[in-house]
Structure formats: C-alpha cells, structure tokens
From Swiss-Prot:
Chief subcellular location: cytoplasm
Cofactor detail note: Binds 1 zinc ion per subunit.
GO MF annotation: an example: aminoacyl-tRNA deacylase activity
Organism whose genome encodes this protein: Picosynechococcus sp. (strain ATCC 27264 / PCC 7002 / PR-6) (Agmenellum quadruplicatum)
Cellular compartments annotated: Cytoplasm
Name of the gene: alaS
Function: Catalyzes the attachment of alanine to tRNA(Ala) in a two-step reaction: alanine is first activated by ATP to form Ala-AMP and then transferred to the acceptor end of tRNA(Ala). Also edits incorrectly charged Ser-tRNA(Ala) and Gly-tRNA(Ala) via its editing domain.
Protein name: Alanine--tRNA ligase
C-alpha cells in the first residue's frame, strides 16, 4: 500500500508551488490576461504564452527565472467537458520557467522534490514519460533521481514533443503521472488508461522554434517551460474522483444544483454532466469578462457567447427555467477573488454582461428548442443544413450547439449544407442590397458599398437635420418602422456622439411630422453611427429627413466628466508619478472611471491632494482649446497619448493650457469652471500593476453628497447620536460584540468540556489503548476540537474521534490521538480523519496528533463514525 498525501486546498497547492520556486530564485509573476498579446491565438491557452517573445529571443527576460499561476482557456475539447474526469475550458497552470538559465537536469530534480517532499506524493505512485529520442532525460530520471526504468515510459512526438501552436517555441518534454493503482504493477503500463493514471506535471525542454513550414530552428537559449494543472493536483491531494469535485469547482456545482432543486450526490449521470458543464463554463466566462472580453459573433467574443449559451441550455436540461447564471457566477467570484481580485472588482460589469446574454438567449431558446424537437421527431438521421442555418440565423444557436444537441439524440448535422446556406446569404447580399438580411454586428461593411460613412457634427451642433439612410429592426434591414418598434438608425450625418474613447454615446430624440424616436444609445460600427432607440410616435421610413436633437443636459454631464478625467490624469502625474499613464476609462453621465498603471495603492493623503488639486483647477476657470494637427507636432508639444492606442497622421488635441493636454476625440467643457465640483469615490486595484479611481463631477457630486448626508442622518437616528458621535458609538458597539463573542466562546468551551467529562466513562478498551467515537450533536468545530483534546488528555493513551453537524447539511469531524498511537502504531490523526471525512463527501487533515475535517452530507455521519470505530478496533487491537 502506498502512503496517502496530505489533503490541501486549491489555494494551498497554488501557494506551495509558487513558494517552492520563489525560494529557488524564481520571482512570482502575476497571471497575464486571458486576452493575449500574441496575434496567432484568440485566448491565453498555456502558462508559457506570455513568455513566448522571450523564448523566441524577441524580448529580454525580466529575470533568468520566473514562476506563475496562469489563467488559461481552451475550447478544443469542449465536447468532453463534464463527461471526463479532467477536461476543462478554464484551468490554472502552475509553472516554473528558465530563460537560458538551468535546464533539463535541474528541472527534473526540482519536479521530483516538489512532488515527493512538498506535496508528499509516494514515489510508488509516480510514473514518468520521456520523448522516445530523449536519452538524456531517461538517464537523468533513472540514474540521478532513481526512478525504476519500468516506470519511465518512452513516448512519440504526438505525446512528448510539446508545442504552443502550429508555429512557435517547442521541444521534447517529460511528463509526471500519478498512478492511482500502483498495486497493478509495472508491466504493460498504459498511460492512456485514465482510470489509473493522471498526468499532473509537464516539463518542456524548450530548444527549438517551429516555422510555418514545420522546420525546427534551435533557439538562442535553452529554456525550461513547465506546467502543473492546479485542478489535477487538487484532485490527487483532495482524494476525490474527478477535478470537478475539488474545492476549486464543486461549490459552483452545488450552487447550480441548489438553483435546480436537486442534490448532486443523488443525481443521475446525465444531470451530473450538465452540472459539471455549468461549473466549468461559469469559471471561464467570469474570468473572460473580468479580463475585458464581451460577447459577440466574432473571435473571442464568440467563444464567450458560446460558453454562456451552453450554460443556459444545460441549466434548462436540469430544470432551471429562468435566470440563474449570476447565482453561480457569484460563487465563482467568491472562489477566485483572493487570487484574482479583478473578478470582484469587476463584479457589476461581469453580472451585467452575463444577464444581458442570458436574457437575449432565453428569448429565442424556447422557440429554437421547439424547432429542434420537431426536427428530431421526424426520426431522420441528420439535421439539414437549412435547419441548422435557421437555428443560427433566427434563434441564435451557435452551429456547435446544434451539433451537440444532435449528437445527444443520435443525429448528425449537415455541415456542408450549413456552410452552403451561409454562402447563399452572402451572395444574396452582394446581388441586391435591398434584400440584405443585415445584422448590426458584422454586416455593416456591406452598407459601405452604397452609402458614405456618417458625418459627425456634434462638436459644434447639438441639433441638425439628418437623412435616414437605413432602418434596422432586430438587426435586419427594413423600409419602415412603426410606433412601438425598437430600431437601429443610420443617417448621413448626426450631432450625436457615438460611444468611443471611454465616453458614452449621446441620448436624445429624432422628430418630424407626427414622429418621435427616443435615442438611448449610439455606437460606432464600420464608420457608421448606429443610433439605438424606439419609435414612440408616428412612423419612420428610409429616405426621410428628420430633426436630430441631443439631450443637452446629458451631454453637459458627459463633457464635465470627460474633462474631469483629463484633469485627474494630470493630477496623478503631478502628485504621484509622472510615468503614470492611462490604461482605460469610462465617461458616463453620472460618473467617471479612470484606470492607470501604478504598482501600489494610493495613500489617503495622495487622494485628498489629488481631489484638492482638481477642484483648484476647476475654480481657476481654465479655458479649453481644441486643435487638429499632425501627430508629430502634438507629441512635440507634450500632448499625452493613451498607451497602445493607434492614431492617424492627424490628431485632435484637447488643451487646457498649463494643466492638461491630451490627444482626444471626445466632447469637453469650454472652461473648467463648468465642471463645478469633483469628488473621488474609490481607489482600487483591478489587476497586477493597474489601479482604478472612480469619481463623480458636476451635479453628480451634489447627488452623491446628498445620499451620504442621508446615510449619516439615518445612522444618527438609529444610534441616537450626533454625526460627530457616530464613529465612537460604532466602535463601542463593536467592542461590546467582541466581548459578547468571547463570552459565547467561553460558554461553548465550558459546554464542550462538560460534555466530554460525561463521555469519559463510555470509552472502550482495545488492547493497551482506549477508543472513544461519539456524535456530539450540533457542537461547532472549535468546541468539538476542545472536547476531543480534553477527552484524549483525560483518557491518556487513546484515540478520540468526534463528529457533529453544526450547520444544516454540513459535517465537522475531529481526531485526537495519543503519542503511542501516532508514533507506536503509525496511525496519524490527519490521514485517518481525512479518510473518514470522504464517507461524508468531504475531506480534511492536520497534524499526526490532532486533525479536523469536514463533509457535505450530514446523513452519512453515523455511518462514518461507525466506520471510524471499526477501523480503530482493527488497527489498535
């Protein structure tokens, strides 16, 4: 029998890995975004991807070594998600990297040390593979590490020659597998047997670059790239049957199960697959949106949309009819926020995007499912290309989703027919633009063949006459729209500002004879300003000339916030660090947000100084100037540009002399005095090295202060205190609560001791030891531990195992063993109680003499305690 490794949480595994390599001169670097800088891939698919330019010699390494926990997304095996024990779309890759520093022998030695000493895997449970031609790696494993040659398996290029993609860095690799059944022996080892083996660590010896023709060129430096799947190591150390039942994912599954009114443990296999799909995909979409990806019909936005729609559909399959995705998203955020704070900081944006996509799909899902049911009922073997295209074009079913549903029902889909229908639509568009099925997103380029891009008049005009060039309803081009219809309008010219540069689009209305169209958003697509609105009165026809009028109050507020954003950047440069640059922004009607690069949080004093500086500039009434000039001239004058932004030869410069000068296409106040007031609401970190300030300006400051004043008044009324006395009153209440909590804990401890005193006489003698196994009712975990320790001390050479159910459905377990048991009999409390906890659907561990564990199924506690007693009798007798 091989020894059992300690039970560690996913967070502990991540920390131990990073700490191990940090102690060996590997700086811990933050995870890169899921949106890669590499243009050859849509998403970050591997831990090494952020280092690809270094491996290629295109960039210098920040240090010769590094270690990371990298967020990754892969969807190439999406059909296996939930059906196998370890396929995921989102996963974390723990990695250690060497950039021309150490190589094969050191990488192998550290991998073995980490596995056997830090994670305490029994060497009997480890099998390694090497590339069939890599004799050097084979010899290191055999001669330096001491692995039995029978447990070193030579594999072909497909398995053990790693590459990041069709092109790029690559090299032979050596993989470490965990063997769940070492008792089966070393003869005829088949690493493809995933019921016995799981690959958990891959060591890539990066030596080559593969070009588009497949040629291998030696890299300038030999590098090391490794990857340990966090979810896989969690499965091993938490001793659960699959990655999904680890603490990294299972709480999400439990939330989904609760929303569906089902119990995971009692569910059939089909239901469990759906729950696992939801658990996996929700992790993916939360992190994708947190990293700035939004749903669309192209590229990574399409990947996001597809994942969200799979979540919604699998929710339907397990009986969830309405909205639920944000319930499970909240659990995913709770699980990730400690390691990835941007998930909590962008919570509002994440949930808005998820709810929008969920609602959009729910609108058409039922009708699409009915069409699919009708098709399946025909008992034909294949869904036609026409039907598949209808499902995509009319009901928003991604083609892959139709394929998946078809497969579940034993059908195939005519992919060629689907592509033919797609091609026909494109040809119809070219032949007669009047009959184009024109979607707002992705098809506006076709309009450019017939009309000119929209001319923007809004820098000088707040109202103008415009000609309606196109009317779209539900993304399709129509001639006329009647009252009550939601429309997207394209005009020859417009005073409406379209959302760009962080500034929100204008609001307002179109009017004419008996016509009113309320405009609530304006977006810029392919050179056209797309006005989103609703016909409130009358009707609208292509070719009509109407009056376009923006909401002046909204424009003034947006202008004030946009200019305030410029002043904020100037103040940050003046007060904190001149090297600060913009990383993103939002200019809304009632608030502003500014993201900037800074390695630390700003102090309260700095924030006060920044706010005071901006309000001083406002009071000084600086006149603004706007000019268009060559970009070289603008930069020579010191105009600030946004890092990474692409500019044309001619740029628009917004200048408040002596205060701020920036390249900007937005709308601004003519004088800083028009802003009125500026107030910082918060300063937070959104990712490594990026900070965010949220603020209000103009009338929004008074609204904000009014709300704050009301809060203070309400608190004063509740505490019967003056505003200046509230802080002291709250501190007094907190002190009282702390004292009460201490008293409560003291009472609980006394109760635990009293209960333990009464149990001493119930101990059973087994050989030279006493054993006591009892159910302690609803005693909490801390009191349970106190009771176990007290009983073991009273009984002397004894094994005490106590269980309780302090929360609805939850289990607490404690084991306290004397020295004669954990040293003399080699029975350790941590390993023992961890095994017992598994019977309750949980896990845990601790020291040899004292350990705690938990479980998810309270109904199994009596059985678990009975098993504990039987095992102790057998072991100690």
């Amino acid at each position: 029998m091989s020894s059992v490794p300690p039970v560690l949480s996913g967070s502990e595994i991540r920390s131990k890995f990073l700490e191990f390599f940090n102690q060996r001169q590997h700086p811990i670097l933050p995870s890169a975004s899921l949106v890669p800088e590499d243009p050859t891939v849509l998403l970050t698919i591997a831990g090494m991807l952020p280092f690809k330019p270094i491996f290629l010699g295109q960039q210098d390494a920040p240090s010769p070594r590094a270690t990371t926990s990298q967020k990754c997304i892969r969807t190439n095996d999406i059909e296996n998600v939930g059906r196998t024990a370890r396929h995921h779309t989102f996963f974390e890759m723990l990695g250690n990297f060497s950039f021309g520093d150490y190589f094969k022998e050191q990488a192998i030695a550290w991998a073995w040390e980490l596995s056997t000493e830090v994670f305490q895997l029994d060497p009997k449970n480890i099998v390694v593979s090497v590339f069939r031609e890599d004799d050097e790696a084979f010899e290191i494993w055999r001669d330096k590490v001491g692995v039995n040659p029978k447990r070193i398996i030579r594999m072909g290029e497909e398995d053990n020659f790693w590459k990041s993609g069709p092109t790029g860095p690559c090299g032979p690799c050596s993989e470490l597998y965990y063997d769940f059944k070492p008792e089966l022996g070393d003869d005829n080892i088949d690493l493809e047997d995933d019921t016995r083996f799981i690959e958990y660590y891959n060591l890539v010896f990066m030596q080559y670059n593969r070009d588009a023709e497949g040629h291998l060129t030696p890299l300038q430096n030999k590098n090391i790239d490794t990857g340990m799947g966090l979810e896989r190591m969690a499965q091993i150390l938490q001793q659960v049957p699959n990655n999904y039942e680890t603490d990294l994912i299972f709480p999400i599954i439990e939330t989904a199960a609760k929303a569906a009114g089902i119990h995971y443990e009692k569910a059939d296999e089909k239901t469990k697959v759906s729950l696992k799909v939801i658990g996996d995909h929700v992790r993916s979409v939360v992190h994708m949106i947190a990293d700035g990806i939004t749903a669309s019909n192209t590229d990574r936005g399409y990947v996001l949309r597809r994942l969200i729609r799979r979540v919604v559909r699998h929710g339907r399959l397990i009986g969830i009819d309405g909205n639920f995705i944000n319930q499970v998203a909240e659990t995913a955020i709770q699980l990730s926020e400690a390691a990835y704070p941007n998930t909590r900081e962008r919570e509002s944006f994440i949930k808005q995007e998820l709810e929008r996509e969920e609602n959009n799909f729910l609108k058409t899902l039922e009708r699409g499912e009915k069409l699919l049911a009708d098709i399946i009922a025909k008992e034909e073997k294949q869904i036609s290309g026409v039907d598949a295209f209808t499902l995509f074009d009319t009901f928003g079913f991604p083609f892959e989703l139709t394929q998946e549903i078809a497969e579940e029902n034993g059908l195939t889909v005519d992919a060629e027919g689907y592509q033919a229908e797609m091609k026909k639509q494109q040809e119809r568009s070219k032949a007669a633009h009047e009959t184009i099925d024109l979607t707002v997103q992705g098809s506006l380029d076709e309009l450019a063949e017939h009309i000119h891009p929209t001319a923007f008049l809004g820098y000088t005009d707040l109202q103008s006459q415009v000609k309606i060039e196109a009317v779209l309803v539900d993304g399709h081009r129509v001639e006329t729209a009647e009252a009550g219809v939601v429309v997207q309008l394209i005009c020859n010219q417009t005073p409406f500002y379209a959302e760009s540069g962080g500034q929100i689009g204008d609001r307002g209305y179109f009017s004419g004879d008996q016509l009113v169209v309320r405009i609530n958003d304006v977006q810029k697509e392919s050179g056209f300003f797309v006005h989103h609105g609703k016909v409130e009165r009358g009707s609208l026809t292509v070719g009509d000339t109407v009056n376009a009028t923006i909401d002046r109050a909204c424009r003034r507020r947006a202008q004030a916030n946009h200019t305030a954003t410029h002043l904020l950047q100037a103040a940050l440069k003046n007060i904190v660090d001149d090297s600060i640059s913009q990383a993103g922004s939002l200019v809304d009607f009632d608030r502003l947000r500014f993201d900037f690069n800074c390695p630390r949080a700003l102090t309260a004093a700095e924030l006060t100084q920044i706010e005071a500086q901006i309000n001083t500039w406002i009071a000084e009434a600086h006149e603004g100037q706007v000019a268009v000039m060559p970009i070289a001239e603008a930069k020579a004058k010191g105009a600030v540009a946004m890092f990474g932004e692409k500019y044309g030869e001619e740029v628009r410069v917004v200048d408040f002399p002596g205060v701020s000068m920036e390249l900007c296409g937005g709308t601004h106040v003519k004088n800083t005095a028009e802003i009125g007031l500026f107030k910082i609401i918060s300063e937070t970190g959104i990712s490594s090295g990026i900070r965010r300030i949220e603020a209000v300006a103009g009338p929004a400051v008074l609204e904000y202060l009014k709300v704050r004043d009301q809060v203070v008044k309400d608190l004063g009324d509740k505490f019967k205190a003056k505003p200046e006395e509230i802080t002291e009153r709250v501190e007094n209440i907190q002190a009282e609560l702390r004292n009460t909590q201490k008293e409560l804990e003291k009472v609980k401890a006394e109760l635990a001791i009293a209960k333990s005193e009464a149990l001493v006489s119930q101990a059973e003698t087994v050989g030279e030891f006493q054993i006591l196994v009892e159910n302690m009712g609803d005693l909490d975990a801390k009191a349970l531990q106190t009771a176990a320790e007290r009983l073991q001390q009273k009984l002397g050479e004894a094994a005490v195992v106590l269980g309780s159910t302090p929360e609805d459905g939850k289990v607490s377990l404690v084991a306290a063993f004397s020295e004669g048991i954990y040293k003399g009999k080699k029975v350790q409390a941590g390993k023992f109680i961890g095994g017992i906890a598994k019977l309750c659907g949980g896990g845990g561990g601790g020291r040899p003499n004292l350990a705690q564990a938990g479980g998810r199924d309270a109904s199994k506690l009596p059985e678990a305690l009975h098993t504990a007693k039987q095992q102790l009798r057998e072991t100690l007798g």
